[in-house]
Design a protein with these regions (language model features):
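A compositional/biophysical signature of low hydrophobicity enriched in polar/charged and small residues
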Residues: 1-107
Length: 107
């Protein structure tokens, strides 16, 4: 399974939920979303800065994208960015193979 890093923001609607229940545990909601599609949530952290939360999960890209779609469609979250962990060495190895055969336009 791939590892995904997901960052996002709460909307005004999401923040209104916190005002109604300041002790709400959103990590449980994130866990429920991951469980619904067979993904594994590894951690949930609230943030100060450009993003309001950070989730680390394992699964497929389709599972991560489904979580994004459903949670943003709820109206409580927005701006979810999904980043997939990669091996930069594997990427570089592929780039070397491509560079040996690729020809730029006009060459």
């Amino acid at each position: 399974m791939a590892k995904f890093y997901m960052m996002g923001n709460y909307t005004a609607q999401g923040f209104q939920g916190f005002l109604k229940d300041p002790k709400t545990d959103r990590s449980k909601a994130a866990q429920t979303a991951a469980d619904a599609v067979g993904a594994k949530m590894l951690s949930y952290t609230g943030l100060r800065g450009a993003y309001d939360f950070f989730v680390i999960a394992e699964g497929t890209f389709e599972q991560a994208a489904g979580i994004k779609m459903a949670t943003e469609a709820s109206g409580a979250l927005c701006n979810i960015t999904i980043c997939e962990a990669i091996s930069i060495n594997d990427v570089a190895g592929n780039a070397v193979k491509i560079a040996a055969k690729y020809k730029a336009p006009g060459k």
